């Protein structure tokens, strides 16, 4: 714990918290200080100009990151018949119906995301108290309740991330790993920013993209100068 504290102090000494850094400079700082022995994730926080307490200003959706996330995503699918076969062909790790539901109820959940065909929601709906708190309950707003389960599986495997404003109106997402090139991380961040911009609520007033910050798994955040994000 002492080593972590020392590293964080050294990082904070290099970063001016009142300053917004050009993307390349911010990323260089973050990578320099991401000295953990594992391949740390690169995370982004985006402060949106919304009132998250109002249901019509909750920003929620998903986006496929062009360079992926660097994570091997395990996908479970609720489907039957032809759709089940399509899900398997697309790379789903687990496909089932009542059997999958019973496995989940028993606490057996070796997967990261759950996708469901609309006609299976009578079964999936009984799992809300289990999947909901884990952020895995299928929802049409993020594309995990869909008749096209094959495409949903492919998107999940390709590096799709889901996003939703927290109570403070902030979006948190992982855009890659320390080992990614700067270009890959920037392309992923731009894809997320583009998706958030398109998802702007009609009732949102004033500046929408208020603040963008990057950090590594074990590091502090660095604010980004948004004018340096132009593709």
UniProtKB/Swiss-Prot annotation:
One of its GO terms (molecular function) is tRNA binding. The keyword Ribonucleoprotein applies. The keyword Cell membrane does not apply. One of its GO terms (cellular component) is cytosolic large ribosomal subunit. One of its GO terms (biological process) is translation. PROSITE patterns: RIBOSOMAL_L1 (PS01199). Transmembrane segments: none annotated. Coiled coil: none annotated. Keywords: Repressor, Ribonucleoprotein, Ribosomal protein, RNA-binding, rRNA-binding, Translation regulation, tRNA-binding. It comes from the Bacteria. Gene3D superfamilies: 3.30.190.20, 3.40.50.790. NCBIfam families: rplA_bact (TIGR01169). HAMAP family: Ribosomal_uL1_B (MF_01318_B). Binds directly to 23S rRNA. The L1 stalk is quite mobile in the ribosome, and is involved in E site tRNA release. Protein L1 is also a translational repressor protein, it controls the translation of the L11 operon by binding to its mRNA. Belongs to the universal ribosomal protein uL1 family. Part of the 50S ribosomal subunit. This is Large ribosomal subunit protein uL1. It comes from Herminiimonas arsenicoxydans.
């Amino acid at each position: 714990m002492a080593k972590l504290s020392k590293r964080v102090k050294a990082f904070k000494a290099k970063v001016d918290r009142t300053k917004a850094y050009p993307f390349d400079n911010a990323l260089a700082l973050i990578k320099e200080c991401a000295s953990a022995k594992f391949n740390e994730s690169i995370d982004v926080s985006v402060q949106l100009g919304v009132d998250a307490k109002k249901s019509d200003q909750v920003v929620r959706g998903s986006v496929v990151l062009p360079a992926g996330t660097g994570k091997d995503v395990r996908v479970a699918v609720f489907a039957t018949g032809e759709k089940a076969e399509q899900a398997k062909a697309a790379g789903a790790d687990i496909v089932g119906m009542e059997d999958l539901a019973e496995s989940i109820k028993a606490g057996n959940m070796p997967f990261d995301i759950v996708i469901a065909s609309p006609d299976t929601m009578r079964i999936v709906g009984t799992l809300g108290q289990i999947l909901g708190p884990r952020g895995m309950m299928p929802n049409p707003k993020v594309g995990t309740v869909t008749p096209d389960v094959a495409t949903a599986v492919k998107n999940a495997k390709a590096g799709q991330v889901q996003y939703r404003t927290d109570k403070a109106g902030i979006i948190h997402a992982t855009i890659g790993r320390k080992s990614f090139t700067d270009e890959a991380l920037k392309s992923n961040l731009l894809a997320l920013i583009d998706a958030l911009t398109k998802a702007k609520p009609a009732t949102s007033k004033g500046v929408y993209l208020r603040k963008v910050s990057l950090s590594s798994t074990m590091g502090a955040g660095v604010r980004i100068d948004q004018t340096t994000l132009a593709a």
